[in-house]
Curated annotation (Swiss-Prot):
Belongs to the RimM family. The PRC barrel domain binds ribosomal protein uS19. This is Ribosome maturation factor RimM. Gene3D superfamilies: PRC-barrel domain (2.30.30.240), RimM (2.40.30.60). It comes from Delftia acidovorans (strain DSM 14801 / SPH-1). It comes from the Bacteria. GO terms for cellular component: cytoplasm; ribosome. InterPro entries: PRC_barrel-like_sf, PRC_RimM, RimM, RimM_N, RimM_N_sf, Transl_B-barrel_sf. The gene is rimM. An accessory protein needed during the final step in the assembly of 30S ribosomal subunit, possibly for assembly of the head region. Essential for efficient processing of 16S rRNA. May be needed both before and after RbfA during the maturation of 16S rRNA. It has affinity for free ribosomal 30S subunits but not for 70S ribosomes.
Length: 189
């Protein structure tokens, strides 16, 4: 029989980013497996607290947003495992199954020069070298060797989509404070 740990009710920070879900209990000492949404889930390792929300569907052990203190998170095989000082056994870990994990963006580690978190690129305006607006970053796709920007733009009153490889050959500059990406790209490509 699973039982919910005592977790403090909280408010989701304005800069919260959903980074994964609690997949299942792991072992008998309260560890749990995390299904991370990123292949490089550094934010899960650096944040000392996670904000949890119940799954959208299925059984819910809690409502609203709760704060989960994190004692340790690490890679194990092909997944992430973590433990909390308030989750002491398998039954308690099982009660968290399906919970959505959020981390404050301010708790993410600083990216290296020339590297960006996808969440920081969403909503940026993309212009070409001539200053022509190509669209707004709506999504990003990982195609294996490279990432592709998915832009939304309007043409003839219709919503359209444009894709630009997010590689140095096409992206000249990313200006996060200015909320702009400059690309070597033409509207008719």
């Amino acid at each position: 029989m699973s039982h919910m740990p005592e977790l403090e009710a909280s408010v989701l920070p304005a800069d919260a980013v959903e980074v994964g879900r609690i997949a299942d209990a792991w072992g008998i000492k309260g560890w749990f497996k995390v299904a991370a949404f990123s292949a490089d889930p550094e934010a899960l390792f650096t944040a000392k607290q996670w904000y949890l929300q119940p799954p959208e569907k299925g059984a819910r052990q809690f409502t609203g947003t709760v704060l989960l203190p994190v004692k340790q998170a690490r890679v194990h095989s092909d997944s992430v495992v973590a433990t909390s000082p308030v989750v002491n056994d398998r039954n308690t870990a099982e009660a968290l199954r399906g919970a959505r994990i959020f981390v404050a963006r301010s708790d993410f580690p600083q990216p290296e020069d020339g590297e960006y978190y996808w969440v920081d690129l969403l909503g940026l305006s993309v212009v070409n070298r001539e200053g022509v607006v190509l669209g707004v970053v709506r999504d990003l796709l990982s195609t294996g060797p490279q990432t592709v920007l998915v832009l939304a733009y309007e043409e003839d009153g219709k919503e359209r989509e444009r894709m630009i490889p997010f590689v140095d050959a096409y992206v000249d500059k990313v200006d996060l404070p200015g909320k702009t990406i400059v690309a070597d790209w033409q509207p008719d490509y």
